[in-house]
Amino acid sequence: MAINLEDKKAIVAEVNEAAKVALSAVVVDARGVTVGAMTGLRKEAREAGVYVRVVRNTLLKRAVAGTSYEVLNDAFTGPTLIAFSNEHPGAAARLFKEFAKGQDKFEIKAASFEGKFLAANEIDVLASLPTRDEAIAKLMSVIQGATSKLARTLAAIRDQKEAAAA
């Protein structure tokens, strides 16, 4: 299906705006995925704050030009679906990693985070980044553990002094 020039410009502008505000990007080959599964993926992506779009490779190369996602240009081959994480850097990678478990033909090509190219086998690093809430919970447990250890130490010192005085 041919796209007129105005539509192409609009697509490039839309994807470029998404790329400018995104924290990370993941490129996949979604060939062979059913329409129902793709609809479900798009719904999950919206809920996770991930912008998902199927774009022609030439338009995609123009859209990411001048952004930190230019490093992905070599991955723009064949049918390409791109996802930009807007709220958490690992959101798109985590979403696609989970989705790929149930889809044989869904292939993660590459990702980019902070201007660095990540090959398909390095996606796990991005997907395993804790969310903001998870990071806060881990920090609080570390602080709580240190606080309780300090309290136990002070109590032991007090008990020793009381025993020595008695």
UniProtKB/Swiss-Prot annotation:
PROSITE patterns (alphabetical): RIBOSOMAL_L10 (PS01109)
Any one of the GO CC terms: large ribosomal subunit
Keywords, sorted A to Z: Ribonucleoprotein, Ribosomal protein, RNA-binding, rRNA-binding
A GO molecular function held by the record: large ribosomal subunit rRNA binding
InterPro entries associated with the record: Ribosomal_uL10, Ribosomal_uL10-like_sf, Ribosomal_uL10_bac, Ribosomal_uL10_bac_type, Ribosomal_uL10_CS_bac
Gene3D superfamilies listed in its UniProt record: 3.30.70.1730, 6.10.250.2350
UniProt key word Cytoplasm: no
GO biological process, one term: translation
Function: Forms part of the ribosomal stalk, playing a central role in the interaction of the ribosome with GTP-bound translation factors.
Family of this protein: Belongs to the universal ribosomal protein uL10 family.
Subunit field text: Part of the ribosomal stalk of the 50S ribosomal subunit. The N-terminus interacts with L11 and the large rRNA to form the base of the stalk. The C-terminus forms an elongated spine to which L12 dimers bind in a sequential fashion forming a multimeric L10(L12)X complex.
Protein name: Large ribosomal subunit protein uL10
Source organism (scientific name): Pseudomonas fluorescens (strain Pf0-1)
Lineage: Bacteria, Pseudomonadati, Pseudomonadota, Gammaproteobacteria, Pseudomonadales
Gene that this sequence comes from: rplJ
